[in-house]
Swiss-Prot record:
<dbReference type="InterPro" id="IPR002885">
    <property type="entry name" value="Pentatricopeptide_rpt"/>
</dbReference>
<keyword id="KW-0677">Repeat</keyword>
<feature type="repeat" description="PPR 5">
    <location>
        <begin position="240"/>
        <end position="266"/>
    </location>
</feature>
<dbReference type="InterPro" id="IPR011990">
    <property type="entry name" value="TPR-like_helical_dom_sf"/>
</dbReference>
<protein>
    <recommendedName>
        <fullName>Pentatricopeptide repeat-containing protein At4g18840</fullName>
    </recommendedName>
</protein>
<dbReference type="InterPro" id="IPR046960">
    <property type="entry name" value="PPR_At4g14850-like_plant"/>
</dbReference>
<feature type="repeat" description="PPR 3">
    <location>
        <begin position="174"/>
        <end position="204"/>
    </location>
</feature>
<feature type="repeat" description="PPR 2">
    <location>
        <begin position="139"/>
        <end position="173"/>
    </location>
</feature>
<feature type="repeat" description="PPR 6">
    <location>
        <begin position="267"/>
        <end position="301"/>
    </location>
</feature>
<feature type="repeat" description="PPR 11">
    <location>
        <begin position="440"/>
        <end position="474"/>
    </location>
</feature>
<dbReference type="Pfam" id="PF13041">
    <property type="entry name" value="PPR_2"/>
</dbReference>
<feature type="region of interest" description="Type E motif">
    <location>
        <begin position="475"/>
        <end position="545"/>
    </location>
</feature>
<feature type="repeat" description="PPR 10">
    <location>
        <begin position="404"/>
        <end position="434"/>
    </location>
</feature>
<dbReference type="GO" id="GO:0003723">
    <property type="term" value="F:RNA binding"/>
</dbReference>
<dbReference type="Pfam" id="PF20431">
    <property type="entry name" value="E_motif"/>
</dbReference>
<feature type="repeat" description="PPR 9">
    <location>
        <begin position="369"/>
        <end position="403"/>
    </location>
</feature>
<dbReference type="Pfam" id="PF01535">
    <property type="entry name" value="PPR"/>
</dbReference>
Amino acid sequence: MVEKDIYMCAEIIIRPQAYNLRLLQKENLKKMSVCSSTPVPILSFTERAKSLTEIQQAHAFMLKTGLFHDTFSASKLVAFAATNPEPKTVSYAHSILNRIGSPNGFTHNSVIRAYANSSTPEVALTVFREMLLGPVFPDKYSFTFVLKACAAFCGFEEGRQIHGLFIKSGLVTDVFVENTLVNVYGRSGYFEIARKVLDRMPVRDAVSWNSLLSAYLEKGLVDEARALFDEMEERNVESWNFMISGYAAAGLVKEAKEVFDSMPVRDVVSWNAMVTAYAHVGCYNEVLEVFNKMLDDSTEKPDGFTLVSVLSACASLGSLSQGEWVHVYIDKHGIEIEGFLATALVDMYSKCGKIDKALEVFRATSKRDVSTWNSIISDLSVHGLGKDALEIFSEMVYEGFKPNGITFIGVLSACNHVGMLDQARKLFEMMSSVYRVEPTIEHYGCMVDLLGRMGKIEEAEELVNEIPADEASILLESLLGACKRFGQLEQAERIANRLLELNLRDSSGYAQMSNLYASDGRWEKVIDGRRNMRAERVNRSLDVA
């Protein structure tokens, strides 16, 4: 009966959409006796927790019932929290670890491993130091995980010190530790040391060789990687995939294809690597060929990465029929359209001229991310549907998504297409004041172009003055064009002079001013401009009417 009550209360905690913590109090948890079987239900729920909030609620439950004082239960809570990839959740797992009276090695290792796989791997060293100061000395897993963290941030010095500590610890040499050491030294650029560690290993496996192989390729040392690949005593499919990806990154598609064709066994990563190789150099027809061959000859099924790459190729080629076939394939195999896949589908239909279909896919996508919103906003803008793009932007904000720099390029371009100057001004101001997005040259370019088209030359000049001089030239050229359209010769002279100050040998200022003077019949100015160009040795042919 006690276990049933605990199970019910765990259900209340883990399902906040149906219950809340106030209902917990009504269950009189304080009156419940905690037996040896009590941790099982709450821990099974904790293992299924998918968010920081749910883990925090499970933690609160354990504190309230006294389960947190049980080392096994507390350690399991930390381990479950540490498996969540969210940085805040890993940090929370660390905070729980620091509150456990006598944490064991498993608990420390869970947090060290979590940080090693996170965006802040250097924090793993902090946990490792805390472990050294405690009663439990690191084991071989502790060393493996903390060395993996050093490899992640190329911490050569830290890795060297931990290597020394491992030797002094008297722990039996372990292939996992030594593989990680090879990776630490290799990723830090110390290839000679990495090779020495590899050569001294009493037992080497494919992972040992791959640790150095991947380090070479990460640094762009393709020739050295190939020499090592040819020397390898043992290869696995990952070894071949590394070489294909390395050649692809270097733009060596022919070499990548040779390795791909020589593979004894391929997995989905192999096919994706070959697709990426062709996409990287713009060979989109070949992307589709590899995809079709994968469907015909391979037991491997395309994954989300494959489909995104193929849809991007269809978009670049304008191949609507192939893109539609991929869409049918996705639906037929029950693949959920979300995130990058949704974005790729929206972009494909838009670039193939089917903006209505792009909007339909967007509306049907239940799990959107910022990239999906950005894609449809940009696509609507390109198709001249500026007002629709701004309506989508309003929906995006209303649904709680935070716009980024790409979002604002899309909405400012939309304003530009429909001539909505006041709305553009408001959005440009909101970028930094509300959404903390600093404007870049692209955002300034949208505003300067719109202001120029509306004849607001002086306001546009003020914006250009906020930009670093080395980026201002292209916007000043745009303004010169606007001056020509509106016949504003005085402003044009001022802008041209500034353009020439930035780059005396750039002929664009002379050329546009010569055209302006010619259109105004001021031929003496045209002649003076040509003389100045010769004086500055600017080679530019001018067509003067």
